[in-house]
Amino acid sequence: MKIVVIGSSNIDMIARVNHLPMPGETVGQARFMQAYGGKGANQAVAAARMGGEVTFVTALGNDMYANMLKEHYCKEGIVTDQIIIDNQNPTGTALILVAENAENCIAVAPGANGSLSTAHIEQISKTLEDAD
C-alpha cells in the first residue's frame, strides 16, 4: 500500500524529572534523552513499520538534526525524496519535561515545519495521485 504522510518532524529533547518545576524553580537530577518526534513523523514511521510504502513530506532545516532525521527515516524504510530543506529556519524541536508521575510539559519550536506550504503540496500532486 502506497501511503503519503504530510506533517511535522521534530527532534525531541526530553528531560525526566522528579516533579515539574514551578515558575522560577530549577529542578536538578534530570535524566536527559533525545528522540525523533513530530506528529507526521510518528505516523510515517508507524505506517512503514506496518508494511506500508511510505513517502514522508515535511520540512527540515539545513542542520545536523535534519541529517539525523533523514537517516532515521531511511532506516525505517521511508521514502525521503519529498522532504524540503529550509535554509532559513532550523529543524523543529520539542522541549519536553516528564515527571515521575507521567505528567509532562511540552514547548515546541516549529522551525522549518512552518515553511511547508500549499505550493509544496501542489508540487507533489503526482505522488499524491499515485498513493492508495
Regions found by a protein language model. Give the residues of each.
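Glycine-rich phosphate/adenosyl-contacting loop at the front of the ribokinase-like
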Residues: M1-A59, M64-M68
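Conserved N-terminal subdomain of the carbohydrate kinase-like
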Residues: T26, R49-A131
